[in-house]
Amino acid sequence: MLEVISIYGFSTFQDLGRSGFYSKGISRSGAADYYALFEGAALLDQDPNSTTLEFIGNGGTFNILEDCMVALTGATMPASLDQKPLDWNTSHYLFKGGKLNLGAPQNGRYSYLHLRGGFSAPKIFGSSSAQPSAGIGKYCFPKDILAQLEKNSELLKCLSIKPFDRFDSTTFRLVKSFQTNLFPSETVERFTETEFSIDNQSNRSGIKLTHTGSGF
């Protein structure tokens, strides 16, 4: 069990998402980085659909209220327990009274804190994935208590995992659509040769890209 002291960016509960509700205007939601959920599940020997805490852009600080086991996956953040560094893509035991701190991601945008037994969160349409813009779930805030869904007394070794390589690519694929031919060929060529960077205003709905020079 954890208590939120501070959240530096945006953080929500996520699992593998919900499907079959587009006709009702409800998107699938779910973790932005599915690989991270499976990596966390492997480290903690649990269901990949277990509820995890997703961080966008920055991490947070947490009080450890009960002994527990966690795993850290996704975009690498500087992590520490009582100011002692913690390895990423690794499972760790956290002991009552400690303080966990997660910083800003260094090689991606979405980072994940997994709790053995999963976090306890309401199931809405079969999923605990939050989508605050649709009134489903909420962001995490200071003083929130993040409880464990299932208690498991079986002891596990702390493990590390080599993550699937997905953070070093800097190339985007351009998929032409029925409107592409409406742009002059010179504009399309300039677009494909332009270097973009990720804007801080990005969110779970999409990643905003910025560039220097005139628009398209």
Question: Which functions belong to the PLM regions below?
Answer:
Residues M1-F216:
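Conserved "landmark" site that anchors the functional core of diverse proteins
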